């Protein structure tokens, strides 16, 4: 075995151990920085800052983060989310019980920020539309769509019941920002075969970082086809890095189920500019790698 690969694997296990034990010693931090690709600010497209972190024991794992949208009026959204490195065994037990991943609890993933930024930049695309976000995590993109685009309805969904509870709280916190847009949270599992009240009802599906696990690809592709309007123009907008061959295999499932897709690498000037800066090296995102970190845009349609 390649000793470098073995060392990297050991350090990744150390990252997981830190998340469970909440270690923070300097030696461990130095070692894991060498292998971790975790970003401190993501693509830094939507300014954010922690505005509250309660010291009480029942709230010690949570923080309130303020996101200031870079649009006219600079509206703010407040999201309650987990602080870093605080996963516990209960999180993994729930993940196993529901046959889901718990990545939505880990952090605010960079592609979610890119999705949110892209959507707020194209309000006309969403105006008057029914929108659903899949695998939303804390719901940043869905909340941005609700606050900045005049969509008629936004459903923010995830398969993890713990995550859905966070979404509900975040919707309630920001309810005054949505104007006339109806916003709700939903626990949605991609292997559900009965979604009669949702079948063929959405104009737009959005999602980010949802294609990493190949075992979910077939169900995800089926869910997309089931949710999109079949007799009117509709689309799904996915943002995801290549991550080896995972994205390629997902797109094959999309094609096999009878949907069509367009893959775009450079879809926004500001995102691309930030990407080029990170490729050259930036301490805010150690070990940045295009294949692993840069989200491509996949536009999926029925092509009626």
UniProtKB/Swiss-Prot annotation:
Keyword Ribonucleoprotein recorded: no
Q: What happens when the gene is disrupted?
A: Suppressed calmodulin (CaM) methylation, especially in roots. Longer roots with ectopic root hair cells in atrichoblast cell files and the presence of nonhair cells in trichoblast cell files. Increased number of epidermal cells in the root elongation zone. Reduced root growth inhibition mediated by auxins indole-3-acetic acid (IAA) and 2,4-dichlorophenoxyacetic acid (2,4-D). Reduced sensitivity to abscisic acid (ABA)-mediated stress leading to green cotyledons and normal germination in the presence of ABA.
A biological process term (GO) from this entry: abscisic acid-activated signaling pathway
Reaction(s) catalysed (UniProt annotation): [calmodulin]-L-lysine + S-adenosyl-L-methionine = [calmodulin]-N(6)-methyl-L-lysine + S-adenosyl-L-homocysteine + H(+)
Compartments reported by the entry: Cytoplasm; Nucleus
- Pfam families listed in its UniProt record: Methyltransf_16 (PF10294)
What does UniProt give as the signal peptide span? none
- Please name the PANTHER family in this protein's record: CALMODULIN-LYSINE N-METHYLTRANSFERASE
Give the protein name, as stated in the record. Calmodulin-lysine N-methyltransferase
Question: Organism classification, top ranks?
Answer: Eukaryota, Viridiplantae, Streptophyta, Embryophyta, Tracheophyta
Gene (UniProt): CaMKMT
